[in-house]
């Protein structure tokens, strides 16, 4: 995802996660548990206890750069937050304190870094950012989320199985907030909300909230296409369409006139059925502060011939990367991918198995349905829904494969789909190292 900081909202994380951040060099904002409510004296004593326990446990993790000592989005309470700040400083005075605010004011504010959850529209309905406050480090702790830019409330549910036009807006909103955050050196940084879908009863669909640029299985959605392109092409060239190449009922004319492609390459050439359709350059006029702005193209296309799309990416005159997409579902297939080819049989080690419906080139197929039925042979167990219904998750799903404690050997997992046939993947379970 090419991010350099993560906000652990709104509770301290497992130490294994912080260990991984230390190893990866991923900066961490860690904060105490809670959301808005700050209760009475006894409740506040518990919040103070949480600050002390968090700092004591995690202060030796070099990845941590901010202690969140406020209850997320809570009203100011100088008496409480003076105590929590002093508690953190007494245990670790090397790091600043902060906590997300919904008030754009330093009245009765006590922390070191002003962190603002900014959900408002600019006059044109795009992402708005409040001006920095003078005299204090100013940080955006949240933006985008499910906020309805150009409207009211938090109603944008970026479901992979939902409205396609809305899905396509998510990446643009994230691009806008980072472009505008980079426009003023007085902004210390931007953390957009959020990385992953999560369970919730507020603003949710079937018990899941959908502000994540990846789904609950950690599989990137269209919204992640902006982030995936923000990397030096010498490290990893990227071409990520912010659309599905599909001509079904939801998108009969294909991606449409305002189609977006995120890439870190200098020039894109689009071929439809081997005919040159467009030559594109990044839109630096609309996104002047992004290192790798998006590309825009008219892709309102007659889909009756089930055309193929090829996107060639260039640096100068050198072809760096080419990606192809098929509109013909007859060649679709079921894809299985595991994160790890080997796991330890220590009773807890597991790996993710992702299954998805893709076209013949491996691109995701919009609104693919049907059930995936899994079977397993060997010293392992399936953790998750089986069979798995793909329709509700937009043709993508996942389970976890855990090795049985103390057992070693080859684990074979077979996935069966009524129209796409079966696929097989293997994992090796090894006994733990002594």
Regions found by a protein language model. Name each.
Residues 304-308, 348-350, 406-410:
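Extracellular Ig-like/FN3 beta-sandwich strand-entry sites
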Residues 275-279, 367-379, 387, 425-427:
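Short, well-ordered beta-strand segments
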Residues 285-290, 378-396:
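Low-complexity "stalk/linker" and mucin-like segments enriched in Ser/Thr/Pro/Ala/Gly
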Residues 295-303, 388, 393-406:
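Short, hydrophobic beta-strand segments
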Residues 5-252, 257, 283:
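Substrate-binding/catalytic cleft of secreted carbohydrate-active enzymes
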Residues 248-254, 343-351:
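Short, solvent-exposed loop/linker segments at the N-terminal edge
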Residues 257-263, 337, 348-366, 372, ...:
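Beta-strand-rich structural segments
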Residues 192, 197-199, 204-254, 258-335, ...:
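Catalytic cores of secreted or luminal carbohydrate-active enzymes
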């Amino acid at each position: 995802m090419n991010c350099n900081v993560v906000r652990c909202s709104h509770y301290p994380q497992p130490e294994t996660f912080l260990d991984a951040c230390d190893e990866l060099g991923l900066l961490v904002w860690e904060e105490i548990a809670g959301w808005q409510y700050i209760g009475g004296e006894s409740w506040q004593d518990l919040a103070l206890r949480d600050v002390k326990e968090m700092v004591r446990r995690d202060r030796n993790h070099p990845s941590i750069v901010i202690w969140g000592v406020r209850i997320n989005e809570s009203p100011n309470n100088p008496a409480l937050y003076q105590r929590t700040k002093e508690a953190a400083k007494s245990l670790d005075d090397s790091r600043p304190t902060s906590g997300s605010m919904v008030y754009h004011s330093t009245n009765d504010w006590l922390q070191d870094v002003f962190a603002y959850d900014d959900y408002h529209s600019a006059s044109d309905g795009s992402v708005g950012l409040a001006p920095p406050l003078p005299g204090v480090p100013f940080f955006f702790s949240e933006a985008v989320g499910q906020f309805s830019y150009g409207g009211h409330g938090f109603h944008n549910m970026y479901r992979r199985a939902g409205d396609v036009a809305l899905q396509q807006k998510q990446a643009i909103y994230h691009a806008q907030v980072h472009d505008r955050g980079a426009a003023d050196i007085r902004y210390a940084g931007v953390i957009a909300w959020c990385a992953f879908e999560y369970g919730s009863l507020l603003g949710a669909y079937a018990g899941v909230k959908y502000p994540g640029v990846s789904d609950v299985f950690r599989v990137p959605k269209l919204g992640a296409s902006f982030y995936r392109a923000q990397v030096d092409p010498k490290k990893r060239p990227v071409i990520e369409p912010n659309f599905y190449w599909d001509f079904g009922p939801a998108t009969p004319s294909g991606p449409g006139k305002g189609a977006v492609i995120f890439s870190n390459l200098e020039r894109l050439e689009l071929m439809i059925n081997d005919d040159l359709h467009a030559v594109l350059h990044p839109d630096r006029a609309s996104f002047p502060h992004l290192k790798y702005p998006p590309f825009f193209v008219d892709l309102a296309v007659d889909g009756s011939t089930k055309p193929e799309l090829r996107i060639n990416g260039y640096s100068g005159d050198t072809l760096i990367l080419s990606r192809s997409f098929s509109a013909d579902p007859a060649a679709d297939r079921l894809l299985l991918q595991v994160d790890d080819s080997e796991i330890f049989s220590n009773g807890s080690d597991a790996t993710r198995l992702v299954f998805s419906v893709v076209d013949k080139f491996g691109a995701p197929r919009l609104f693919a349905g049907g059930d995936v039925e899994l079977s397993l042979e060997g010293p392992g167990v399936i953790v998750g829904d089986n069979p798995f219904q793909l329709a509700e998750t937009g043709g993508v799903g996942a389970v976890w494969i855990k090795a049985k404690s103390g057992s070693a050997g080859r684990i074979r997992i077979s996935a069966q789909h009524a129209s796409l046939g079966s696929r097989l993947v293997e994992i090796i379970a090894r006994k733990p190292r002594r």
